[in-house]
Amino acid sequence: MVYRVFLSSTSKDLAAHREAVHRAIDGLDGFDPIRMETFGARDTDARGIDEQKLCEADLLVGLMGHCYGSSPPDNPTSFTEQEYDFAVHREMPRLMFVASDDFPVPNHLIEPDDKRARQKAFRVRVMVDR
């Protein structure tokens, strides 16, 4: 059996970590990673997450730093949080890796206060959900 693993994270602040996790999953026998980079942009990406790709997954692996990331124009919830919420709704197993409070964020990636507050609340919710 091959387990399909959906990799979820913001990309600007965690690009290197995301790539390392992808390589690790891809190198395991019996595991097939799914990530946005492999299925490319779609018309629905501007409005929300790719639920079809999430439904194909057996497991969600999430990486959480301190950046909230982007969201669709009509919804303030980030794509990463939407992916997490969809996995929760589907009762999909989740492995969430949450960066420590002192994990560095480069100055050029520091988000506005409203996004930082959303990310902080999202991080707390994920840690409580374990």
Regions found by a protein language model. Name each.
Residues 50, 77-78, 109-113:
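Short low-complexity, flexible loop/linker segments enriched in glycine and/or proline
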Residues 100-130:
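C-terminal interaction surface of TIR/SEFIR-family domains
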Residues 62-66, 98-101:
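Short loop/turn segments at strand-loop or loop-helix junctions that form parts
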